[in-house]
Structure formats: structure tokens, C-alpha cells
């Protein structure tokens, strides 16, 4: 987290995380480490949430975001948990605890998302 702050996390969160990942990759390469980085990360400023999924090698930890709240309520009207979510809520998790079809959308490896007031935008994530 502190390293990402050093690389501009507050000004441009995705770019700051990409620069941080690039720095770790370059240090790893210099030390002869073949796959130095595996990460799923989420940060927020209280209004936006940025999350990224990345690994140096082929094995990448998982990361998911939820469908919109209205869809969740329609899919699972008996699930009381969804009644407590605000209309613009989204949930981001490393691994879903429950297998609810239609709820979880996997974020691809090498991607980041920006969640703003219930919308989810996906962008490429590539170390710089």
C-alpha cells in the first residue's frame, strides 16, 4: 500500500498500482525471481473503489464483483442480506463464500475495475 502511494495511488489509483507492480517486477527480475508478484488489491477514497487482479506468472488469485443490487434482489428475493445493501452497492471479494449463480462476476487476470455509484468499469491492468 505504501509503495503504491509512492507511485501516485492518490492521483491516479490504477496507474499508481501499475507503477508499483512494475517496480516490484523490475526488482524481482534483477534478483533473478521469475514470478515475483501475485496480487489482488482493492483501495477506496470513500466514493470510488478500485480493484485489480494481477500475477507475474500463470497462476493468479481470484477476484470477483457482485451484480447490481436490483438484480440480486430479483434473483434471490428470500435472501435477507441483499435487503441491507444500498441501491448503488457492489461487493468485491477474493472468493465468494456462497455459490449463488448470477451474483458473482470474475474479474479477469490483468484487469482492474473502477466501481462508482453502482457502476463497474473494467480497464486493462499492466505493470509499467
Language-model features and meaning:
Residues 1-128:
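Conserved short alpha-helical segments that host acidic/polar catalytic motifs at enzyme active sites
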Amino acid at each position: 500500500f505504501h509503495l503504491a502511494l509512492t507511485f501516485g495511488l492518490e492521483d491516479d489509483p490504477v496507474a499508481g498500482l501499475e507503477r508499483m507492480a512494475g517496480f516490484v517486477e523490475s526488482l524481482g527480475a534483477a534478483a533473478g525471481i521469475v514470478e515475483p508478484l501475485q496480487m489482488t488489491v482493492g483501495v477506496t477514497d470513500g466514493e470510488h473503489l478500485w480493484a485489480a487482479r494481477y500475477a507475474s506468472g500463470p497462476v493468479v488469485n481470484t477476484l470477483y464483483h457482485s451484480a447490481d443490487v436490483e438484480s440480486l434482489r430479483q434473483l434471490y428475493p428470500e435472501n435477507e442480506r441483499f435487503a441491507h445493501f444500498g441501491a448503488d452497492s457492489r461487493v468485491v471479494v477474493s472468493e465468494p463464500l456462497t455459490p449463488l449463480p448470477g451474483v458473482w462476476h470474475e474479474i479477469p487476470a490483468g484487469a482492474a475495475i473502477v466501481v462508482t455509484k453502482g457502476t463497474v468499469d473494467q480497464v486493462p491492468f499492466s505493470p509499467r
